Amino acid sequence: MLTKFETKSARVKGLSFHPKRPWILTSLHNGVIQL
């Protein structure tokens, strides 16, 4: 399963990759956390 995820943000504060699944966790400077 391939899913395209897109969001507009000026800056990303943190980025983390899941070791076994194709997931990316991002924390944005506006306080939003997205998986």
UniProtKB/Swiss-Prot annotation:
Q: In which tissues is it expressed?
A: Gastric, duodenal and jejunal mucosa. Circulates in the blood. Seems to be confined to specific endocrine cells.
Q: GO molecular function: any one?
A: hormone activity
Q: What keywords sit in the KW lines?
A: Hormone
User: Which InterPro entries does its entry note?
Assistant: WD40/YVTN_repeat-like_dom_sf
According to the record's subunit comment, the protein's assembly and interactions are: Oligomeric complex that consists of at least the alpha, beta, beta', gamma, delta, epsilon and zeta subunits. Interacts with SCYL1. Interacts with JAGN1. Interacts with TMEM41B. Interacts with SVEP1. Probably interacts with PEX11A.
* Function comment: Xenin stimulates exocrine pancreatic secretion. It inhibits pentagastrin-stimulated secretion of acid, to induce exocrine pancreatic secretion and to affect small and large intestinal motility. In the gut, xenin interacts with the neurotensin receptor.
Protein name in UniProt: Coatomer subunit alpha
Q: Which organism is it from?
A: Canis lupus familiaris
> Gene behind this chain?
COPA
